[in-house]
């Protein structure tokens, strides 16, 4: 019998990707296509859904060409996606009624300010989220209120809403399936994560018709069949990108935690079947497999890798990002310099939009190497901030941090991360954890892999970083960071700008 394969569709914020995996989780082929970012007004960020669709089809074809396999041997498809980004389309024509409003878009702040002032506790208790333009709910309301005939069509059932996974499943199945999974639904700010259903009271508050919303299903089951590649292939896995990365890190047990270092960083802690509430972090659904639901705590750090980009492009201190590691390693320590990357405020656990970036502790002896080191160290300090709150609010002791994303390749940073956390930092062999996670979910539901235990055997470690720093020095460094953050907080409110 011919060997079968799983293809992961990974629709991100800047590009559409596809990766072909075999049963041993080897990567056979990768396809990637970037698409346009639209900024029609300050605070607005949009994508063209049709451009995403075309980019995704090209990525699938590229991945299959590179894999050099018979297309008839694709057993199933998994879809992972940028979360919260909102698409609405006409069910008759299949065409979007407006561009996709991206998770970064801030135009709906007046809506969410109203919700925060009047319904904060209700929304937090039911959805696990804090009212913010980040999530889908206010984006849906904006489209219904501002696009001609949108509300009228929605009331008649002529319009559908979806996060990007839902839109792609609709397109792949030629309009036969209008579905999402628990993890994506939990990022809309409309889904009751306790009852596992759309929350009618929140829908009424926002005047959103329930008829436009997709069916919500577990993250590993057959949602429909993709009519592409001249065959009918089951779409059998679906998860938001950060939840897929948690699954791809084999973080199946309560207390398992991962940090993805990208432009910003996302930290997710598996809290098992326990729905843990936190004032400083988001409560979300990690995944649903079978009849069980796994919950997670999430901390979002706004600026990590973007600080390296600023050091490269803004200060022109380095030519390419990879140069920061040897530069930072050329000095034995930070020389008393701290860098707080509050370019757009601070996320978890501070949630201060008025904080601003700060470099402090500069002396005549400070060099760009000290600043480079302070930038890398800021990523580790912010991770420590979030993990501290996670342990406090969940009551779960965290023993190790699993890492992925671009900056996790930086050995100096990973060693400092282990030192400052006083815990092991574990880096996997395959860094494509998001795509791998949804490939696993897709393969499980069609029997490609028989169990999560089987998947554990296939996951391989690249390196484990053990903590080496003494306690007194660790505490001194971290107290310096906390003092630097204190000085950055509220800056824009104090002096304006």
Swiss-Prot record:
Keywords: ATP-binding, Glycerol metabolism, Kinase, Nucleotide-binding, Transferase. This is Glycerol kinase 2. Pfam families: FGGY_C, FGGY_N. ATP binds at residues 13-15, 263, 305, 309, 406. Disulfide bonds: none annotated. GO terms for cellular component: cytosol. Its EC number is 2.7.1.30. GO terms for molecular function: ATP binding; glycerol kinase activity. Sn-glycerol 3-phosphate binds at residues 13, 83-84, 134, 241. Gene3D superfamilies: 3.30.420.40. NCBIfam families: glycerol_kin (TIGR01311), PRK00047.1 (NF000756). Glycerol binds at residues 83-84, 134, 241-242. Belongs to the FGGY kinase family.
